[in-house]
């Protein structure tokens, strides 16, 4: 649900009544007529600096972007960390870090930290005024699909992002005031969904408590059910419906950190 909120906001805007034009890109479809598109090569500029082993080790989590890696968490750290980190790449706060092997999964984002990452990562300076908008937009589903198209490999788990193909990916640019409005709108929309889920969870828990109390009262004789007539009913075998769970799983994936 949250991914849908972001995807709709960064491709269609917040005003459903504005004129729409065909973007000319199959993955994008129609976009607001007054928005523009540019290539990622106009925004992202490669950056490479090493020999900073004293900086904190960073990682990319699909659902959270760039985070400080907890090197003491042995359960989450599946990848080998070498003793010599001088070959690791530096990432500055505000730069764009990307795991090129898992870009098709959304393993990238604007870094809020200065640190170091695996030499296998791509690091870019970002020529875009509103970094928060860029972060929301580039991590939306539509761009994950673009990065999947720009990745090559024999098997899915070994796809490697082609930087030349990546440079040609189109990026939708709303006017600056709309970028600001979208950045302000998204967390508010997220909070509404979180509150609705919390309320629904509490209501379900209350119903379970009432159900359990009713069963307990019947079993212990506090409620006399001897004169209650049981209606005829047709037995229907229940099947497990996991569609809702699968959808929620997309928003609450495990933090599979990558280095």
Predicted regions and their residues:
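Amphipathic alpha-helical coiled-coil/heptad-repeat segments
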Residues: 1-17, 173-259
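Non-catalytic DNA-recognition/assembly elements of restriction-modification systems
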Residues: 22-53, 168, 176, 180
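Positions in alpha-helical segments
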Residues: 23-26, 38, 119-122, 132, ...
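Sequence-specific dsDNA recognition surfaces
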Residues: 24, 41-93, 239, 251-259
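Short, well-ordered beta-strand elements within core beta-sheets of diverse protein domains
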Residues: 26-30, 79-82, 122-126, 167-173
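A cytosolic small-molecule/anion-sensing beta-strand core signal
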Residues: 35, 92, 219
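A short beta-sheet element
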Residues: 88-89, 93-166
């Amino acid at each position: 649900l949250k991914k849908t909120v972001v995807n709709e906001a960064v491709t269609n805007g917040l005003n459903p009544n504005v004129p729409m034009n065909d973007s000319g890109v199959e993955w994008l479809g129609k976009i607001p007529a007054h928005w523009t598109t540019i290539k990622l090569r106009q925004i992202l500029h490669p950056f490479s600096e090493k020999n900073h082993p004293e900086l904190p080790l960073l990682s990319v989590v699909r659902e959270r972007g760039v985070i400080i890696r907890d090197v003491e968490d042995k359960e989450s750290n599946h990848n080998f960390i070498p003793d010599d980190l001088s070959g690791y790449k530096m990432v500055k706060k505000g730069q764009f870090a990307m795991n090129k092997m898992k870009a098709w999964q959304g393993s990238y984002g604007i870094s809020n930290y200065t640190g170091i990452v695996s030499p296998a990562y791509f690091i870019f300076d970002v020529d875009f005024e509103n970094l928060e908008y860029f972060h929301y937009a580039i991590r939306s589903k539509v761009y994950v699909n673009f990065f999947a198209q720009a990745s090559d490999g024999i098997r899915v788990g070994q796809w490697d992002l082609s930087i030349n193909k990546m440079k040609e990916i189109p990026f939708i640019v709303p006017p600056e005031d709309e970028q600001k409005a979208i950045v302000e709108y998204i967390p508010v929309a997220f909070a509404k969904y979180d509150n609705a889920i919390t309320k629904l969870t509490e209501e379900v828990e209350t119903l379970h408590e009432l159900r359990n109390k009713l069963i307990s009262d019947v079993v212990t004789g506090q409620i006399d059910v001897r004169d209650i007539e049981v209606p005829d009913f047709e037995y229907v075998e229940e099947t497990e419906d996991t569609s809702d769970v699968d959808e929620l799983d997309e928003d609450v994936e495990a933090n599979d950190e990558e280095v």
